[in-house]
Structure formats: structure tokens, C-alpha cells
């Protein structure tokens, strides 16, 4: 009787662990369409990004290393993004 309960516990534990791993991987692998397409503006010291309703605003995204920025933002008509002085820029 104990071995049957133990087997069921292990089975459901493995199922729940598998589900959690799949959910975690799915949330990390976002498509590039979810990453905003930003640019630069002479009046903006940060990134010039679209918001809801088609309006643009100046935002700042902080970064620690060069690899952080491509996960946060895409650049329109320029190379990059890259990390400069702790902020992502295009």
C-alpha cells in the first residue's frame, strides 16, 4: 500500500516539475515582436519608443552587460542596441 502511494506521489511530482519547466522556458523565449522597436531622437537622451496609441515617448532601459540590451529593445535604422554607461541605446 505504501509503495503505491509513493509511486503516485513520484508520478505527480514529475508531471508538475515538467509542467513548470515548460512554462518557464516558454516565458523566456519570447518572439522578437514582443520586443519594442525603438530609435533615437535629438531631444531624447534615452530610447525613442512607441507606446499604446501610436505615440512615442523617451524611455531609459538600464543594462549591466552588452548582452542585456538585445533582450529588451530592438533598434530601427541603426546598429545595436548596445549598453553605454549603464543604459541601452541605439
UniProtKB/Swiss-Prot annotation:
Protein name: Defensin-like protein 293
Cellular localisation: Secreted
TM helices/strands, residue ranges: none
Signal peptide: 1-26
Species this protein is from: Arabidopsis thaliana
BP GO terms, sorted: defense response to fungus; killing of cells of another organism
Disulfide bonds: 63-83, 69-88, 75-90
Top-level taxon: Eukaryota
One GO cellular component term: extracellular region
Keywords: Antimicrobial, Disulfide bond, Fungicide, Plant defense, Secreted, Signal
Lineage summary: Eukaryota, Viridiplantae, Streptophyta, Embryophyta, Tracheophyta
Family: Belongs to the DEFL family.
